């Protein structure tokens, strides 16, 4: 599967890093807004202030964590594309596993194995769903079979039975 909308590898890393940061800030912002609202003292003004404060403090941190994950994933993916010479789902699956392992390296080998498995499984699921969606949508755009004329709508040939009356023949 080739992805035609993707940037070339050096720019892909920057693009994925920025996209992951944005996704982390937005998703983390929503989550932190709800968390800050629920944990603030009673009163709408206090709850609103707690919500904004939680977003202001935590959303950039979450975005940064997502950016690190996206940048490392994209760097490993580009390295595998260069090493293997082809771009396929196995690169993404391997990149997810290696990214999980590298980011969990400070927690020890057992955490590295667990994170590698989770990263590989997560990316395998994402790639599998992408392949299924691509195949499903490709079926919608297949060429339709040619339209065949209905024989009952054609004009009768000389000496052939009239349409709708199989045993009736004209005599000359």
From Swiss-Prot:
Organism domain of life: Eukaryota
Originating gene: Timm17b
Record's subcellular location: Mitochondrion inner membrane
Organism phylogeny: Eukaryota, Metazoa, Chordata, Craniata, Vertebrata
Main location: mitochondrion
Keyword Chloroplast annotated: no
Native source species: Mus musculus
Pfam family, one: Tim17
Entry keyword set: Disulfide bond, Membrane, Mitochondrion, Mitochondrion inner membrane, Protein transport, Translocation, Transmembrane, Transmembrane helix, Transport
Gene Ontology molecular-function annotations: protein transmembrane transporter activity
InterPro entries attached to this UniProt entry: Tim17 (IPR005678)
The UniProt record lists the keyword Acyltransferase: no
GO CC list: mitochondrial inner membrane; mitochondrion; TIM23 mitochondrial import inner membrane translocase complex
Disulphide bond pairs: 9-78
Topological type in the membrane: Multi-pass membrane protein
Sequence intervals crossing the membrane: 17-37, 61-77, 113-133
The name this protein goes by in its record: Mitochondrial import inner membrane translocase subunit Tim17-B
Subunit structure: Component of the TIM23 complex at least composed of TIMM23, TIMM17 (TIMM17A or TIMM17B) and TIMM50. The complex interacts with the TIMM44 component of the PAM complex. The complex also interacts with DNAJC15.
Region listing for Disordered, in residue ranges: 147-172
Function: Essential component of the TIM23 complex, a complex that mediates the translocation of transit peptide-containing proteins across the mitochondrial inner membrane.
A Gene Ontology biological process term: protein import into mitochondrial matrix
Family: Belongs to the Tim17/Tim22/Tim23 family.
